[in-house]
Amino acid sequence: MYIKLDIQTEFEVKSLSDLPNFKKLMGNLKMKINKSQLARELNVDRRTIDKYLNGFTPKGTKNKTSKIDTYYEVIAALLSSDSKQIFYYKRVLWQYLTDNHGLKCSQSAFRAYINRKPEFRTYFDEGKRILSGHSVGVRYETPPGEQAQLDWKESIRFETKSGEIVYVNVAVLLLSYSRFKVFHLNISKSQSVLMSFMTEAFEMFGGVPKVIVTDNMKTVMDEARTEHFTGTINNKFAQFAQDFGFKVQPCIAGRPNTKGKVEAPMKLLDEIHTYQGRFTFEELHEFVQKLCARINQTFHQGTGKIPVFALKQEKNLLQPLPKSAIRDSYMIKHKLVKVNTSGMISYKSNQYSVPAEYQGKTVGLQVYDNQIYVYHNMKLIVQHKISQSKLNYKEEHYKKALAKSLPKYPNIDNLAKQNLSVIGEVYRNEE
């Protein structure tokens, strides 16, 4: 398993509204802003540049925070499915908050606030309570190096460009302070895959956070945490946590509110569906890594930081990595093999195809969970299911190799399918 991070640091100022974010970026980089150059390029006065850099927003577009926002958590709890209390009217809720929580605002201001929040408005319009498992919950921040959040985007049905249906999973590990995250696409969610992924993610972070917040996934918890039971951590994962020096903090089953920071990237992973039928598995793997890099280089609205730059600040406060011998013991083993002249690699006396351009090159081989993963220079180039057949071709590999040897043949697609069918029958009879 390899994770490659491609970091770009260019930022284009197209208008005055870009200046606040530009100031944050330059602040992260500890670089001085050339206000005179900005004034010339945007064709405005230097004083205007100063004004926008200091947070000026044109009249009518300024986003004002409401003092009622401080009561968001209380309101969400009162209107949730866990609450036994019932509020038939907004006025009744306003009165309750005024009497019991010190709310100081007019009824009209309170009604307007509720109407601006769809999750609250539907309670009164349609009688729908806020589901506990999906409520926003308390917004809180953790100090640098303190916490990371772990989750899976599970069982994503994906159709490859060849028409094959695969169910893929994406693991996400996110540092809570910087919001820097690492994605990993895999068919498997096994414990060996999880621990190998986390090891490589820690290496990418440059250290280990003190706490890992997770749900009650079976690879971590033998028994789920509930409101009345602390849960039981799996022995092997407990040893992994001890070796790396972090504490496991499972969420209460069915109420993963404390894992809210990692939930937002899960929605971004829905971009995968826009490429249904367009990617091979290997191309999908590459897309997920590019998506992760893009998110890490984008301003985070909640923190006002760019995760990749905020990581530089957080890295110094992470715990040190354990010795390489410990880290290596959790990594999925990697073996170097050479691609033969037929564009195949060997595994246990059977051969598996790779793209034609890797013929004669040395590639990396990883085998786990009944799958073979082949890498070249940290890039996943092909994935095969382990088979008992002597020859195992991906149709697109065979087709390209055939087209190279028979460049003028009129219908390579049909010939490739016929040949592969014959090859399959020949070796099936020899088994």
From Swiss-Prot:
Record keywords, A-Z:
DNA recombination, DNA-binding, Transposable element, Transposition
Gene Ontology biological-process entries:
DNA integration; DNA recombination; transposition
Domain HTH IS21-type span(s) in chain numbering: 20-79
Give GO MF terms, alphabetically.
DNA binding
Q: Name one Pfam family in it.
A: rve
> Where DNA binds (residue ranges)?
35-54
The family classification in the record reads:
Belongs to the transposase IS21/IS408/IS1162 family.
What is the protein name given in its UniProt record? Transposase for insertion sequence element IS232
